[in-house]
Regions:
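Short acidic-glycine-tyrosine-enriched beta hairpin
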Residues: 79-99
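Short beta-strand His + acidic residue motifs that chelate non-heme Fe in jelly-roll/DSBH
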Residues: 59-61, 80, 98-104
Length: 140
């Protein structure tokens, strides 16, 4: 059975932007074991999204074209810079090339804010980036 969206409590300041319980948001699958919800309030300005990552799941290896701040709302994750649990904030920029992995036994729920796009790296990143370039060239 596929796990449903997370049901973690959300900090009060964030609840006003969501407008509904976290379990009722329009979560979009990103890859197996990972979903996201883009906060429409910030569309076109900054990348502000919620990420839900199943325990043990690794995100694709990536770096950053700008600054990323990630607040852990539930669960935990780790990368080469350390371990992050509920309430921790991780920062990353163009000097960081990492592959965060969700830990623990519960979904890792994070609020991620990016002022520029991520850039996938490693072999899988090269394949995905090449496919995205081809789609742009053929207009899809």
């Amino acid at each position: 059975a596929r796990p449903g969206p997370p049901v973690a409590p959300v900090p009060e300041p964030l609840r006003g932007y969501l407008g509904k319980p976290i379990s009722e948001l329009g979560w979009m699958p990103v890859m197996a074991g990972m979903r996201e919800y883009q906060l429409p309030e910030f569309a076109g300005r900054a990348g502000v999204r919620l990420l839900a990552i199943e325990p043990g799941r690794r995100m694709p290896r990536h770096t950053h074209e700008g600054l990323e701040l990630t607040l852990v709302l539930q669960g935990s994750f780790a990368d080469a810079s350390g371990d992050y649990a509920k309430g921790d904030v991780a920062t990353a920029d163009a000097s960081v090339d990492h592959q965060p992995q969700a830990g623990g036994r519960e979904v890792c729920l994070c609020l991620a804010i990016e002022d520029a796009p991520l850039k996938l790296t490693g072999f899988n990143g090269m394949v995905i980036n090449a496919a995205a370039t081809v789609r742009k060239l053929v207009g899809r």
